[in-house]
Structures are given as C-alpha cells and as structure tokens.
From Swiss-Prot:
It comes from Emericella nidulans (strain FGSC A4 / ATCC 38163 / CBS 112.46 / NRRL 194 / M139). The gene is csnB. Residues 482-491 have a biased composition (Basic residues). Residues 492-506 have a biased composition (Gly residues). It comes from the Eukaryota. GO terms for cellular component: COP9 signalosome; cytoplasm. Keywords: Cytoplasm, Nucleus, Signalosome. This is COP9 signalosome complex subunit 2. Component of the COP9 signalosome (CSN) complex. Residues 252-420 form the PCI domain. One of its GO terms (biological process) is cleistothecium development. It is found in: Cytoplasm; Nucleus. Residues 482-506 are annotated as: Disordered.
Length: 506
C-alpha cells in the first residue's frame, strides 16, 4: 500500500475521532497529541528516521490507550519495515495488537490490521522481509485466536498460505489449506455458502500449487469445482488466477480452443482488477491463437484492441502477424530480435509447436514446384538444420501430406509421380473441355481473340496456355506429380525456363 493510500485510510479513520469533552485540559492534551502526529507525517518522506521517533512518541502522550497511539504505532511500523528495521517493526506490531481488544473499535481494528498486512505483503521482496511477514501473520493469529473474529482469522490465514505458495513450501501450504477448508464447511462436511468468497481464494491457491507441481489430475478436479461455486461474488483477480491456471491445464492437454477461452476470460478479469498480469495472459492468448492455426486476429475484440499498440505486447503482435501471413523469415526474425518473449517458461515451452507448424508450412510451399530436391536445399532456404528438415519431411510423408521418398545416403528427396493416374486422366479431360470452351466462346465467337496465334498452347494440347486459365492448386499439384512441366514459350525462352515444374534442385 502506498503512502497516499495510507493517508486516505487515516482520513477515513479520523471520522471516529471527533469527541466532545467538557474539560479544557483534555482538549489541550488531545490537540498536542494530534499536532505531534501530523508533524511526524509531514517529515516522514524527507526524514523517516526522525518521523519514526515522533510517531512512537504519540502513544506516550496518552493517559490511556486510544486512537492516536494506535495510529502513531501504525505509521512507525510501516516506516520501520520500509527501512528494513524488521525486528523493530515486529516489536511495535506486537504492541499495536494490544490496542485491538479495547482501545479501538472492532471494525476499525480489523480494517487497520488487514491494511497493515497488505502493506507488508506488497513490500516483501527478500528472505528477511518474508520472515518478518511470517512473524506478523503468526502474531496476528495468536492475538485473535481467542476472539470471535473469524473473518480476520480467515483472511490472515489465507495471506499466510499465499506466502508459503510464493516460497514454494508446498507441505506447509497443503496443511494450511486443509485447515481452512474445514473452517469453510458446515457440520455435515458440505461447503458453507456464506464463505464462498474465501472458498474461491482457497481453490485459487490450490490450483496454483498443482499447476506449479504439474499435478494435472488434481488441478482439473479443483478447477471444475471452483467454476461450480455460485455463492460468492469473487474478486476479479481471483477469477483471473483460476482461469489462467485452467488455460495452462488445457494447453498441456493440447486443447487449444478451451485454452484460448480461459485465457481470454483470465485477461478480462485481470484487466478489470487492474492487475499487471493481464499483459502476460494476453501473450498466452496470442500464443493459443497461433496454436489453433486461426486466421482471426486476437486484437480485434473490444477488450484486447486497446493493447494492440502496447510496446509490452508488440513482439507478440508482430509474431502473430507473421504467422498469419505464413512468413517464416519474419516470424524467425521477431523471435531472434525479442529474446524476452522466451523469458516466460510457459511461452518457451509451447512456442516450439508454433515454430514447427510454421516451418512445416514453409517447407510445403518451398518444395511445391519440384519433383526432386535435397535436404540441404531446404536447410538453406528455411534456415533450419538438415536433421530437422528430414524430421519434418518424414512427418509429412507418414501423415500422407507428401508422397515422396527420402534417400538418406545422398540426402535427396524424390516426389512420387504415379500415385493418382485416374485422377490425372480426369484432369486432362477437364482441360480438354476448357479448350473446347475457349474455342467456342473466344476463338469462334465474338469475344476477345488471341492475336499471337503462334504462341505455344501449353502441356502438349491445342488451346490457351493453361497456366493463365486459373488452375487450382490441386490441379497444378497433380500435373506436377505426373512429370508435366509448364513452359513459357516465345522469343527468348531458354530450355527449362518459365513457369512450372522443376525436376531437380541440388
């Protein structure tokens, strides 16, 4: 929590402080305490050490424990923690907890303790700070153990469980989660609907633990139970966590569509909560779009459109653009120029599948005109190793997407040419029909006429050049497999030049 936030809380707290006393001495004393408190606040930024002494002097001015002493201790503890004076912070926090039973109201004390623990949690960034935070939680739980404040007990325990998750102390976390689950149940063992919000927070903690430990079986069961909770109005950040882990679970199962749906919901919830994790999850959303081989731009939705030009996401924007254009070289260039994309272990783990899809499509596009080529030819043009080129070609052959044979000794690939004779004959009949149609409508009719009657008509038949007649890819592929070659005739043509089939490339 920032200092500004703290000022706001203090301002709100001070609504409780207006008391009207008849004794002038008491009024003078209160004014002196109040002045000391606000003087300390004025110097806390420029001179925090002196401010701590001033804040700690406030409780001593009160005859009985009261609001001003409570506030002074709060401010001193936060400054001590910020300056790394952890033992002093723990000592004064122990003193602060003596105020909560009688000196201040229950609601005010609960709110203040919660805010204090949030401040400590957000400011912890090293092992000593974590140890201090754990002591704060322990002192809080001991202080409220014999009180009837179950709400604060639950909140503090959940914070402690979150600390153990961050420190990967899964044994401690599992015990604490089981204890909290029992606290959120009725006597018959069923979930208590009145504690649905706490229950979702527990599910979120467990789901994160099982996601980190790769226990997908338990993760899936908890994920489904969490989505069935209807008795709570959860914080959007909690739902963002649950959906993010659900998306990762679906990714591990290669269920790209469900993963995309969960990542989108996670992004939407993080965005609503103002969490910076929305940027990372948006990257995951882009990743699933590529894994789905979708042509839909993930930045076209109303929720994601504002982030399309965000510099933190620009690398992923360029990546999906290159992917959807089937531009393997642009795709590889984006990855090489933005190594931070692979800094996320989850993206690094799954981007290989996208890269392989890109290289597979690039190879199919590259070899389309040829009946014979070498592995080194592919390696050179796609910029991959010969081993990977052979691996991808083997996959295409086994998947019946390429009818070819690999000669490993010579490193040569020969595309088979006689696999579909019947279909080729049908294609030739279709070509004959096109020739007849051309004669009727253009040559013998009133339509456009070909002035260059001496121009070759292509593929050994009379009629127009078929490479200009709009042959589809399948037809062209069949003609390649039969060994036919298109040639541009006319002046200046060299043998083997022009559009069409190349029988060998080494």
């Amino acid at each position: 929590m920032s200092d500004d936030d703290d000022f706001m809380h203090d301002s709100a707290d001070e609504e409780y402080d207006f008391e009207y006393e008849d004794a002038d001495d008491d009024e003078t004393g209160d004014i002196g305490i109040e002045n000391k408190y606000y003087n300390a606040k004025q110097i806390k930024v420029d001179n925090p050490e002196e401010a701590i002494d001033e804040f700690l002097g406030v409780p001593a001015l009160e005859q009985d424990k009261g609001d001003w002493g409570f506030k002074g201790l709060k401010q001193a503890i936060k400054l001590e923690f910020k300056l790394g004076r952890y033992s002093d912070a723990v000592e004064h926090y122990r003193e602060l907890l003596t105020y909560v039973k009688s000196a201040v109201t229950r609601n005010y004390s609960e709110k203040s303790i919660n805010n204090m623990l949030d401040y400590i949690e957000k400011g912890s960034d090293d092992e000593k700070a974590y140890q201090c935070m754990e002591e704060f939680y322990s002192l809080t739980l001991n202080s409220f153990q014999n009180t009837n404040n179950e709400r604060l007990w639950l909140k503090t325990n959940i914070k402690l469980a979150r600390l153990w998750l961050e420190r990967r102390e899964y044994g401690q976390l599992s015990k604490k989660v089981r204890e909290l689950h029992r606290a959120c149940q009725r006597e018959d063992g069923s979930d208590d609907p009145s504690k649905g919000t706490y229950l979702l927070e527990l599910y979120a903690l467990e789901i994160q633990m099982y996601a980190e430990t790769k226990n997908n079986k338990r993760l899936k069961a908890l994920y489904q139970r969490a989505l069935r909770v209807r008795s709570a109005v959860p914080h959007p950040k909690i739902m963002g966590i649950i959906r993010e882990c659900g998306g990762k679970m679906h990714m591990s199962e290669e269920n790209w569509e469900e993963a995309q749906s969960d990542f989108f919901e996670s992004f939407r919830n993080y965005d609503e909560a103002g969490s910076m994790q929305r940027i990372q999850v948006l990257k995951y959303l882009v990743l699933t779009t590529m894994l789905m081989k979708s042509d839909i731009n993930p930045f076209h939705s109303q929720e994601t459109k504002p982030y399309k030009t965000d510099p933190r996401i620009s690398a992923m924007t360029d990546l999906v653009d290159a992917f959807q254009r089937d531009d393997i070289h642009a795709y590889e260039e984006v990855l090489s120029k933005n190594p931070d994309v692979l800094a996320d272990p989850f993206i690094a783990e799954n981007i290989d599948e996208v890269s392989r899809n890109m290289r597979t499509k690039a190879i199919l596009k590259l070899i389309a005109p040829y009946t014979r080529f070498t592995l080194s030819f592919i390696s050179k043009h796609i910029k991959i190793s010969v081993t990977e080129a052979q691996d991808i070609l083997s996959f295409l052959i086994l998947d019946k997407k390429l009818n070819a044979k690999i000669d490993q000794e010579s490193g040569t690939v020969v595309v088979e040419s006689a696999s579909d004779v019947e279909r080729l004959r049908s294609v030739e009949e279709w070509n004959e029909s096109l020739r007849t149609l051309w004669q009727v409508t253009l040559k013998d009719g009133d339509g456009f006429k070909n002035d260059d009657v001496s121009q070759p008509t292509g593929i050994g038949m009379r009629g127009p050049l078929l490479y200009q007649s709009g042959l589809d890819d399948d037809t062209a592929g069949l003609l390649r497999s039969s060994g036919h070659r298109f040639r541009r005739g006319g002046k200046g043509s060299k043998a083997g030049g022009g559009l069409g089939m190349k029988t060998g490339l080494f």
